[in-house]
Amino acid sequence: MENNSNQLAANQIIEHDRLTFGDQFAPKGWYWHAFGSKFAGPRILRLPVLVRMPIFILRNLRFYRLPRRIPFTFDADGMATMAIPSFLKTSKFVSAYFRMRVASRAVVDPGLQWRVHQAIWCASNSMKIEGDFVECGTGKGLMMSAVLDSLPDWNNSSKRMLLFDTFSPFGIDSTTGKNSEEHGTRGTYATNIEDVAQNFSEWQKVELIKGFLPETLTQGNIEKIAFLHVDLNHAPAEVSVVRALWSRIQSGGIMLLDDYAQVQQQNDAMNELAQELSFEILTTASGQGIVIKP
C-alpha cells in the first residue's frame, strides 16, 4: 500500500479477521430434512398399513422434521451453494479481495466474494480485447480496486480505466436519479473524489470523472470499450448509459451489470433494452448480469 490511510485500513482488517473464529469463506446454513425421508417414494408402500398411516399423518403435519446442517461452501450476498469455489483459495483472488476491503475502509467483511470473482473474470478476459475499461458508478472504488489488483500487467498495457461517479456520499433519489441528503449517506459511496483518487494512486492510466451520467460520458473521450461495469443504482440512468456506450463495446467485450437481478426495476429495464439492442444477459446467482458483445 502506498499511503498511510490504506495501510491503516489493511491493518484493521487483518486484526479483525484474526479475532474472527471460523472460516469466513465457508459458512454453514440450516435446512429442513425429514427423519422419514428414507421411506420416500414407493418404498413406503412396502411397509405394513399400520406403519404407513402414522408416517403419512406425521408427514402431513410436519411434526417429524428437525433442523439439520447443510455444508454450504458459500453463503452470502443473496446466494448459497454447495459448489466448489476453488477461486477463494487462489492467491490472485485473496489479494484482490483484500484490496477491495482496504478500499472500503470497513473492517467487517461485506461478503462480496462471488461478485468480486465475477468482476475479476470479466476483466481478465477483457484484457484480450481492444479498448478501455469503463465503470459507471464507482463509489469508493471497491470493485475496480479488486480488478486492478488482479491484473499485474495493467501498468504495462495501453488500456485506460475510466471511473464515472458523482463521488457523493448521499443516496439516490428514485425519481430524479440524483444524490439527495434526504436519503442519507451510503457506506459504499465515496465521501469525496480526493479519497478515491488516492485509493487508485498506485495504478497508472486511471481517470476519475465527476458528475451525473450520461451527461459526463463526453468527457472521457471513449472510442473503444473492452469492459463496461454498470452500477448506478438507478434504472433510467443505467439504460441511458448502456444505450450510449453499446456501440463502442468491441466484439468479445464484456458488460457487467451489478444490480441486474437484485432490483426489479433495473431487471425489467435491462430486459427491455436487451430486446431493443439484441443482446443476451446471463443471470448469476449473486444477482449480477453478464453480457458478452457478439
Give the role of each language-model region.
Residues 10-11, 41, 46-48, 246, ...:
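Low-complexity, intrinsically disordered short peptide segments enriched in small/polar/basic residues
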Residues 51-61:
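Alpha-helical hydrophobic membrane-insertion segments
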Residues 1-13:
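Soluble, non-transmembrane catalytic domains of enzymes that act on hydrophobic metabolites at membranes
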Residues 16-44, 48, 61, 67-131, ...:
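Class I SAM-dependent methyltransferase Rossmann-like catalytic core
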Residues 4-6, 38, 279:
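Compositionally biased regions
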Residues 32, 87, 92-110, 127-294:
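S-adenosylmethionine/decaboxylated-SAM
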